[in-house]
Amino acid sequence: MSFEAVNLYEKSYKNFEHWRSEFCGEVEQQTKDEPSLLMGYSMGGRLAMDACVNRPDLWSGVITVGAHPGLISHDERDKQLKKDLEWSRRFRTEDIHELLKEWDRLPVFCGRSNCSSREITELDSEKISHFFDVFSKARQGNLSSLLKNHTLSPLLYISGCDDLKYTKIGQDLAASCRQIRHEIIPNAGHRVPWENQDAFISEVSVFIDSVLNK
């Protein structure tokens, strides 16, 4: 099996639809009839969900980590868009070192320090600013109902035990659809792949084996 990491920095996407068309088109060309698995964390997990429900024919399995399926009410969307556009503005205009310190203190990270490797020099403030705008949860479709009716590829939803918000999302999704399995990783918050690597890799490996050997 070969693996390929998607670099969102390589292109400038206009919206979810543009990203989906480009990404799924490339996957379709490259994989032909070979089994394809898709994995994404946080924002990448939201993009993975979008590709999963809109092009279910492409995937043998999907793994999402700490990903939101979408907002329901207009009020939620308005509030989220206001927040994301403010972050977008700040990443365009403020010092990225100080901004990232503030970002790491957000409640979603469960009070845990960032243990992932991060090279500040490799980060592009303009691109990050753009992502906050075009990939805002406010601009994402509400995928919950589509995921509940998902009947093709199995989906593994992973959350950390300390990440109560996303654990509840995973539980609700798994309860609503037999194709969705939810696994809670111990000793981890939102940044599961870095906070408990061994347990994360173990769950992902079991899922991949089950998909490829069914």
Predicted segments with their positions:
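Flexible "cap/lid" loop of the alpha/beta hydrolase fold
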Residues: V53, W59-R92
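Catalytic histidine-centered segment of alpha/beta-hydrolase-like enzymes
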Residues: A188-I201
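Catalytic histidine neighborhood in serine/cysteine hydrolases
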Residues: A175-R191
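Gly/Ala-rich beta-loop-alpha elbow adjacent to hydrolase catalytic centers
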Residues: G40-G44, A48
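Active-site loop/oxyanion-hole signature of alpha/beta-hydrolase fold enzymes
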Residues: S2-M39, S202
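Conserved serine/cysteine hydrolase catalytic core
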Residues: S125-D172
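C-terminal alpha-helix
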Residues: E203-V211
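Helix-loop "lid/cap" segments that line or gate small-molecule binding pockets
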Residues: L85-F91, E102-S113, F131-A138
